[in-house]
Amino acid sequence: MLSKNQRKQILLLKQKKYRIQKQLFVAEGEKVVQEFIDAGHEMHQLYATFSFQHPLCESISGEEMQQLTHFKTASPLLAVFSIPEETALAPSDLMIALDGINDPGNLGTFIRLCDWYGIQQLVCSPTTVDCYNPKTVQAAMGSLARVQCHYLDLAPWLQQSELPSYGAQLEGQNLYTSALRPKGVFVFGSESHGLSDAVRSEIDHFITIPRFNKVSGAESLNVAIAGAIVISELFRSSFPTQK
């Protein structure tokens, strides 16, 4: 049976300050939990409402799981993992950076995108949502087990970087006529505020996804969708054209 203290400690991990203090985070759902297990992340607790073969697994009822979940509907599997020790940002020809992305779902989607395209690091401003927020962990669908998020002040980092930097915004060079390659730092800002002034001042080039419906009332694309389009275009252009 689940103790009151166990329940309290897990629910506290919904808050960033407790995740930092305890250096722990919660993962929910069979796929997400299994991805972290397979990646070798240190696990402290594991709860299941079904028979799950693992030495740490504790069987609990569906009602107890509903008391633990950070979501409206509980998944049948929940685990508590250690937050991995942060390693230094490794040199890479292609970097994705996020400036003030505060929606957990958008960050989770960027993490999935990086994983899909083999980008193992994601650079985030301090104003970007915590990657171990339960909603981000869920949205990343296990990709967080393979992609490391680095939180740092973007402006001085961009200033020191030897890579060319590209900022995504409404006014910029047409993405489809830019002949870009997967080399450089590509920076995405929040939908509501765009790139911060400090970051914008360090950007070398600005790119935009042209709007084809000129009479549309749509003001912008969702930032994660924009990120998917840009990253896909970078890799598409790296393939040789078939004759």
Predicted feature descriptions by range:
Residues 167-217:
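Active-site/ligand-binding-proximal alpha/beta "capping" segment
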Residues 53-66, 93, 163-165, 179-185, ...:
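Active-site regions of enzymes building and remodeling cell-envelope glycoconjugates
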